Swiss-Prot record:
Part of a complex that catalyzes the formation of methyl-coenzyme M and tetrahydromethanopterin from coenzyme M and methyl-tetrahydromethanopterin. This is an energy-conserving, sodium-ion translocating step. This is Tetrahydromethanopterin S-methyltransferase subunit C. Pathway: One-carbon metabolism; methanogenesis from CO(2); methyl-coenzyme M from 5,10-methylene-5,6,7,8-tetrahydromethanopterin: step 2/2. Its EC number is 7.2.1.4.
Length: 270
């Protein structure tokens, strides 16, 4: 795969910022564009079949996982879970507000856009607070925080639309919020954003392997939507997507690993 070089700022030992090169297989702009288009269109056509938004969540999760990768790469990985749940903390509020707006006057696609924009604004504010007030020396904090909350918002919107069968307030409230499924969807979205880089971080980490794991996590979101709705079509499609993406991730893991050995059953300690 052809690698492109992405220039980002880094913090030098003396505290000043300097430019470093990061090799990426797919540019962040392309991932964001794909995530936005798929997520918004998936929400807009949720009324046709819940499988559409259930599958559309996958590229949205991949986009968010890449944003987590870019910002969490500045540390040792200890803040990866925190930033994933932060993204869905702000994203859940924006997603519910988008659902409340959706109905007769505001179409689903417009509500999805409004919710994503609100999520982006929340993310930008969190990024500014993190960097300017808390003094976290992460130069890409503002942009990545914006993308993480925006992608988390849109991923949650897609799953809400998939479970509800449409992205209108009446459907979302009765089938997602009143039933308590909103908590399950919130958790699976947050874990899907944070887990890929958290599992792959280290000196041999590559964007390709991390994002394939992100696609695998997104496929599990589809499976959860199928289970929540007892819809066999969504469930089988999600399971098929999971098998494909997990197989690809496993192949890349074996490629990048120094060796793959069977150690046997761990012996019981005294």
């Amino acid at each position: 795969m052809i690698l492109r070089t992405l220039l980002i700022s880094a913090v030098a030992p003396g505290g000043e910022e300097e430019e470093v090169e990061v090799a990426v297989a797919i540019s962040p702009l392309k991932l964001m564009t794909a995530g936005l288009i798929c997520g918004i269109l998936g929400t807009a056509f949720a009324w046709v079949h819940p499988l559409i938004p259930a599958l559309a969540v996958i590229p949205v999760v991949v986009w968010g996982a890449d944003a987590v990768r870019r910002v969490a790469g500045y540390g040792l990985g200890t803040g990866v879970p925190s930033i994933g749940f932060m993204g869905l903390g702000g994203g859940s509020v924006a997603a519910i507000l988008a659902a409340a707006l959706s109905g007769n006057t505001v179409p689903a696609w417009a509500a999805a856009i409004i919710g994503t924009v609100i999520g982006a604004v929340v993310g930008a504010l969190l990024g500014v607070l993190d960097r300017r007030v808390i003094k976290m020396k992460i130069p890409v904090m503002e942009r990545c925080s914006t993308e993480i909350v925006a992608s988390g918002t849109l991923a949650l919107i897609c799953l809400m639309a998939a479970v509800a069968g449409d992205f209108t307030w009446s459907a979302v409230y009765s089938k997602v919020i009143a039933t308590g499924l909103i908590a399950v969807l919130w958790a699976i979205c947050a874990i899907s954003l944070l887990h890929p880089f958290n599992a792959c971080l280290g000196p041999s980490e590559t964007q390709e392997r991390t994002l394939w794991l992100g696609a695998e996590c997104g496929s599990l979101c589809t499976v959860v939507a199928g289970l929540a709705t007892a819809n066999p079509v969504v469930l089988l499609a999600g399971a098929a997507a999971w098998l494909i993406t997990f197989w690809k991730f496993w192949e890349l893991t074996k490629r990048d690993a120094a060796d793959v050995v069977w150690t046997g059953i761990v012996p019981k300690g005294e």
